[in-house]
Design a protein with these regions (language model features):
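Membrane-proximal, glycine/serine-rich, low-complexity loop/turn segments characteristic
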Residues: 20, 63, 70, 74, ...
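Bacterial Sec-dependent N-terminal signal peptides
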Residues: 1-31, 123, 131, 223, ...
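Outer-envelope beta-barrel architecture signal
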Residues: 20-28, 68-72, 129-133, 171-173, ...
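Predominantly the C-terminal beta-signal and adjacent terminal strand-loop region
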Residues: 161-247
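Residues on the lipid-exposed face of transmembrane beta-strands in outer-membrane beta-barrel proteins
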Residues: 30-32, 56-66, 76-78, 116-124, ...
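Extracellular/periplasm-exposed beta-strand and loop segments of Gram-negative cell-envelope proteins
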Residues: 36-52, 81-113, 142-174, 195-201, ...
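Short glycine/proline- and aromatic-enriched beta-strand/turn motifs that initiate or cap beta-hairpins
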Residues: 20-62, 224-230, 234-236, 243-247
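Membrane-proximal helix-loop-helix units in multi-pass membrane proteins
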Residues: 124-154
Length: 247
């Protein structure tokens, strides 16, 4: 229901702006993401590592400027999000006791998913100077999952489309600043857990019950460059003209 309401609002906003001949433009960019996580398993605060990712992060935005100082944007994004746990074997998700051969062994587990996002944000600032603050919400579909395990110097991994191990749809809120030149600094917080507490099964042949995860919340800080399509086109045309002239 919420998704249908969002689509309706965006459709109405689009046609209202078209009718009023306001400024509408497209922009594109990527992201460099540094993320962290808050993980608790069976009452234990699990040690987590910071996660640095560059690939694959793509953002396409439709910008609606009501005035020179107030507007909004929506669009689509694809990004790589997840968490890294590094702790004793019994603390990273496995349903084992002290008789297990791996008990008390240092183990690293990486959970990640590619996410398709649908953002909606308000922006306030000086659009003529390309300098503004923004804040909003995003709904992300976790469509491709990967898990890696590192133990005793060995690495194991598997992937799955639409895995039940992560929540399918995760909402988030974010705030950020765009600076002249298109540089962006953003903070995002995911409002739901990353892992699905209803999942019961096996990971790498070991029994797991994700209901034992009391929390698997993630957040991130990102740097990006967002450029208007007309700016990108101008750069391409200028580079092409320079190459032709050089020949």
């Amino acid at each position: 229901m919420k998704r249908y309401l969002l689509i309706l609002i965006l459709t109405l906003a689009f046609f209202t702006l078209k009718a009023q001949n306001k400024n509408i433009y497209m922009s594109s960019g990527g992201e460099i993401i540094l993320s962290g996580a808050d993980v608790n398993f069976n009452g234990v605060d699990v040690n987590t590592n910071m996660r640095f990712t560059i690939f694959l992060h793509v953002q396409q935005q439709i910008n609606f400027n009501f005035t020179d100082n107030l507007g909004l944007y929506t669009g689509l994004s694809i990004r790589n999000v997840g968490l890294i746990m590094e702790d004793y074997y019994q603390n990273v998700g496995y349903d084992v006791d002290n008789t297990d051969i791996n008990y008390n062994k240092n183990t690293k587990i990486k959970h990640r998913s590619y996410a398709l996002g649908f953002p909606l944000a308000i922006k306030v600032g000086s659009f003529d100077d390309n300098f503004f603050a923004y804040g909003g919400v995003e709904y992300e579909w976790m469509f491709h999952y990967k898990q890696k395990k590192f133990i005793d110097g060995d690495k194991y991994k598997f992937t799955a489309w639409n895995s039940d191990r992560v929540n399918t749809w995760i909402p988030s809120w974010f705030v950020g600043l765009q600076f002249p030149g298109g540089f962006n600094l953003k903070f995002k917080y995911y409002m739901n857990d990353f892992l699905n507490k209803d999942f019961v099964g096996q990971d790498f042949g070991e029994d797991v019950d994700y209901s034992q995860f009391e929390s698997t919340g993630i957040w991130y800080i990102s740097l990006s460059v967002m450029l208007k399509w007309k700016t990108i086109k101008r750069e391409i045309d200028e580079n092409f003209d320079n190459k032709v002239a050089y020949r």
